Amino acid sequence: MLRDRDDNLLEHDKFIRDNIRSTDILIVSVGANDIALRPTATTIARMLQMAWLTQFHSIENRSAYALPYFKDMFGTKVQSYVSRLTSKTKPRAVVVCMIYFPLEWEKGQTSWANAQLKALRYDSYPEKLQMAIRQMYEVATRKIRIEGTQVFPCALYEPLDGKNKEDYIDRVEPSAEGGRKMAARFVEILEGIV
């Protein structure tokens, strides 16, 4: 969870911080579990507000009331986390990922996250959450900068766009094929760097 790192790095984060080399490339994908797995009461309120009380055009034009909350989560907090991971040694590059789209609903699909996806209206109106994720990428992930290294934003929703069930397990986890598509995107982003 990203919020578990607000004040202190976890042990495996400290391992990265203490062992990363200047020739390494760091790929960071955090924040999804703060929304889907164990959200805070505030996160739940903001997600439900976005899903049920916000017009699509307000998300699209970035005037949605809840958007600054997620801009802070996926922008300011992720940047702080990456800065602390790279505080001892700056890697060659950092790839910062925005979450992928969950698999869109079809009859008969099962998932541990079905209740959460339904509460977010993803089963009936996936375009709304997808637009919110796109906007969070634009206003947060794409703006992350870490002094002393190159930062490359990565929209994981491009290779995992919620349309192909072969890319997912339980609607919210990448399958082997989904993982292959994400890896191909990383290679594409880093072409010319490595």
Q: Where are the model-predicted features located?
A:
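Short, amphipathic alpha-helical "lid/cap" segments that border enzyme active or binding sites
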Residues: 13, 71, 75, 79, ...
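Conserved SGNH/GDSL esterase-like catalytic core that processes O-acyl groups on lipids
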Residues: 1-73
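Short, well-ordered beta-to-alpha junction loops that form the rim of enzyme active sites
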Residues: 97-101, 155-158
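Substrate-gating cap/lid alpha-helix
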Residues: 104-154, 179-183
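A structural motif corresponding to the C-terminal end of an alpha-helix
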Residues: 73-95, 132-155
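Short catalytic/ligand-binding loop motif for oxyanion handling, primarily in non-cytosolic enzymes
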Residues: 3, 34-38, 102-108, 161-164
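Acidic carboxylate-rich catalytic motifs and surrounding loops in phosphoryl-/glycosyl-chemistry enzymes
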Residues: 1, 149-167
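Histidine-centered active-site loop/cap adjacent to the catalytic His
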Residues: 166-194
